[in-house]
Amino acid sequence: MKIGVIAMQGAFREHEQTLARLGVETLRIRRPEQLSQIDGIIIPGGESTTIGKLLGDFNLMEPLRERILSGLPVFGTCAGMILLAKEIENSNQPRIGTMDIKVARNAFGRQVDSFEVDLEIPEVGQEPVRAVFIRAPYILEVKPSVQVLAKVDDKIVMARQDNMLVSAFHPELTDDLRIHRYFIEKVCKGL
């Protein structure tokens, strides 16, 4: 199995390191033709407007959207969650827009408002998951086809819809491998 990581801006190296710890081969994605070489893809955290612009500039936006709609497993963290959302509150920024969610950007506040919290995520295990939130979004609305996996103060911070998994937090910034393992075992192999 080979997982692509969008490698234009943001925390792509940290995702690669986490996947390597799980024994998963990775490929840095920067060109549309690379999409045929992977079994799943991660869209990392970073700055969603910048990543969206770069996806357009590198002619990756449409091919990536088509591959995801055709069933390519995708995991979007923070900015990646924003880019996968069909709707972004008060924004018309470029996005992939494949997941039936509405998100609010920087919803937990600015950089100084970043925080960590232990999350209950039964889908990934009984023990709480340490979640790192940095200028994080959250999900305002989901369609019935979207499974809510985790909340913080009644705000949705992790969800899944078929081949699409999103989190408002950064699992790649902790030593806990369970979220990435869930993506590989349940989303990629579970389809």
UniProtKB/Swiss-Prot annotation:
Its EC number is 4.3.3.6, 3.5.1.2. One of its GO terms (biological process) is pyridoxine metabolic process. It catalyses: aldehydo-D-ribose 5-phosphate + D-glyceraldehyde 3-phosphate + L-glutamine = pyridoxal 5'-phosphate + L-glutamate + phosphate + 3 H2O + H(+); L-glutamine + H2O = L-glutamate + NH4(+). InterPro entries: Class_I_gatase-like, PdxT/SNO, PdxT/SNO_CS. The keyword Lipid biosynthesis does not apply. The keyword Lyase applies. Keywords: Glutamine amidotransferase, Hydrolase, Lyase, Pyridoxal phosphate. Pathway: Cofactor biosynthesis; pyridoxal 5'-phosphate biosynthesis. The active site is at residues 78, 170, 172. One of its GO terms (molecular function) is pyridoxal 5'-phosphate synthase (glutamine hydrolysing) activity. One of its GO terms (cellular component) is glutaminase complex. In the presence of PdxS, forms a dodecamer of heterodimers. Only shows activity in the heterodimer. Belongs to the glutaminase PdxT/SNO family. This is Pyridoxal 5'-phosphate synthase subunit PdxT. The lineage of its organism: Bacteria, Bacillati, Bacillota, Clostridia, Thermoanaerobacterales. The gene is pdxT.
